[in-house]
Design a protein with these regions (language model features):
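Short, electropositive alpha-helical surface patch
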Residues: 73, 92, 147-165, 183-194, ...
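Histidine-centered catalytic micro-motifs
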Residues: 10-22, 135-141, 192, 245
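Short beta->alpha connector loops
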Residues: 21-24, 79-83, 172-176
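Divalent metal-dependent hydrolysis catalytic cores, especially in the metallo-beta-lactamase
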Residues: 14-15, 27-54, 67-80, 96-108, ...
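His/Asp/Glu-enriched, well-ordered alpha-helical/loop segment
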Residues: 234-301
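Histidine/acidic residue-rich metal-binding segments in metalloenzymes
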Residues: 3-4, 87-100, 108-241
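Active-site neighborhoods of metal-dependent hydrolases
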Residues: 192-259, 307-340
Length: 343
C-alpha cells in the first residue's frame, strides 16, 4: 500500500553515527543534526575517546559544530578492559554506551580488544552490568572478509551467556547468522544500516568497483540482505536503525587503499521511506525502526522533532562539503519537505 504523498516521522534517531572531528566534523555534522533528534556517537577518533574529560570535550565540539540544531549527541567511550567500577561510575551520566572494537578491525581501532578472554573482560563488563551501561560491539574477527561477522557470533554468544544482565548491541549486522542470534539471548540487540538493506557485495564489486559503497562490515550475499530486511521491515523489537554513516574525503575513497565507510546521513530517512513503501511495510513499522525501538532499548527521551517527507523526486547531490554520499547524482523517491520541533 503506497504511503501518503506527505507524512511525518516523529523524533528519528540514528543509533550508530560517525561525526569525526576537526574540519570534517564541522563539514558534515549538520547533515545529521538537521533531520535526526539525536544519535549514538562513535568514539574511534585519533586518539580514541577514552576518558571523562575526552567525552565532555568531544561533546562540546559536536555541539559547537551543530549550532542551534535540536539534536542530542549521545556519547560513547572506547572500551578498554582496564576500566574499573569507580572510573565508570564517575562518567555514567556522561555516556549512553561503551563501544568495543576488535583490535585493528576498522577505522582507528588499533587500541581495541584482542583475544576476548572472558576473565580479562569480566571486571569491566560486570561493572557495566551493574551500572546499566550498554555495550556496543563491532562484531568481526580477522578471518576471511565474508566470514568475519558470522565467525564473531560465537563471541557474542559467549559474552551474552557470561554477562546476562549486560545489554549487548550487535552493531551494523549484515548476516543471517547475526539475525538468528537475536532471539537466542534476551540481552542481544542490533542496529542495521540503510546501505546494508539496499546493497549486496555485487553492488560493490560485481562490476566496476564502487568505492563509495565499500564499508566494514562489507556488504554480504542476497540471502543475508533478505534476513536483514525481514527484521527491519517488521521493526523487530530488538532492532534499531543505526546508519554507520562514515564520512571520508573524496580523495580517501577514490584511491588505492580505499577507506571503508558509506556516507548516508543526508539521505537516510528518504531511503528508508522508499524502502519501507516498496515492501508494503506500514509507516508504523518505519516509525518503530527509526525511533520507537531505540527509545525503549536505550531508555532515552530525546527532544521531539517532526520530519515531513514528500513523495517528490530528489536528486542526491554529488557531494556534501567534499564528502560523496551514497547514490550521488542519482534520483530517489522522497524529499524532506520540512523539519520542525515537535510537541
Amino acid at each position: 500500500m503506497p504511503f501518503p504523498t506527505q507524512f511525518t516521522l516523529d523524533t528519528p534517531l540514528d543509533m550508530h553515527l560517525h561525526l569525526r572531528d576537526g574540519e570534517m566534523l564541522h563539514n558534515i555534522a549538520k547533515a545529521s543534526a538537521q533531520t535526526f533528534s539525536g544519535a549514538i556517537i562513535m568514539p574511534n577518533l585519533v586518539p580514541p575517546v577514552s576518558s571523562k574529560e575526552e567525552v565532555i570535550a568531544y561533546k562540546a565540539r559536536i555541539e559547537e559544530a551543530i549550532g542551534t540544531e535540536n539534536f542530542t549527541p549521545y556519547m560513547t567511550l572506547f572500551f578498554k578492559p582496564v576500566y574499573d567500577r569507580a572510573f565508570l561510575e564517575d562518567l555514567r551520566d556522561d555516556i549512553a554506551a561503551i563501544k568495543l572494537y576488535p583490535a585493528g578491525i576498522t577505522t582507528n581501532s588499533e587500541g581495541g580488544v584482542s583475544g576476548f578472554d572472558i576473565e580479562e573482560l569480566r571486571p569491566a563488563l560486570e561493572a557495566m552490568s551493574d551500572l546499566d551501561i550498554p555495550l556496543c560491539v563491532h562484531g568481526e574477527t580477522n578471518g576471511f572478509v565474508m566470514d568475519r561477522e558470522a565467525e564473531f557470533v560465537s563471541i557474542y554468544e559467549r559474552l551474552a551467556a557470561a554477562f546476562p544482565r549486560l545489554k549487548i548491541i550487535m552493531e551494523h549486522i549484515t548476516t543471517k547468522e547475526s539475525v538468528a542470534a537475536l532471539d537466542r539471548f534476551k540481552n542481544l540487540y542490533a542496529t542495521i544500516t540503510v546501505h546494508h538493506l539496499f546493497i549486496t557485495l555485487d553492488d560493490v564489486a560485481g562490476g566496476m568497483l564502487q568505492p563509495h559503497l565499500f564499508c566494514k562490515p562489507i556488504a554480504k550475499r542476497p540471502e543475508d540482505r533478505e534476513a536483514l530486511l525481514k527484521v527491519a521491515l517488521d521493526a523487530h523489537p530488538k532492532v534499531m536503525f543505526g546508519s554507520d554513516s562514515a564520512p571520508h574525503p573524496r580523495e580517501a575513497k577514490e584511491s588505492c587503499g580505499c577507506a571503508a565507510g558509506v556516507f548516508t546521513a543526508p539521505i537516510a530517512l528518504q531511503l528508508l521511506t522508499q524502502l519501507f513503501e516498496a515492501h508494503d511495510a506500514p509507516i508504523e513499522k518505519l516509525q518503530a525502526f527509526i525511533s520507537g525501538n531505540a527509545r525503549r532499548i536505550y531508555d532515552i527521551t530525546p527532544s521531539a522533532k517532526e520530519v515531513v517527507l514528500e513523495k517528490r523526486p530528489f536528486v542526491v547531490p554529488a557531494d556534501y562539503n567534499g564528502v560523496v554520499p551514497m547514490y550521488a547524482g542519482e534520483t530517489i523517491d522522497y524529499t524532506i519537505r520540512e523539519v520542525r520541533d515537535g510537541q
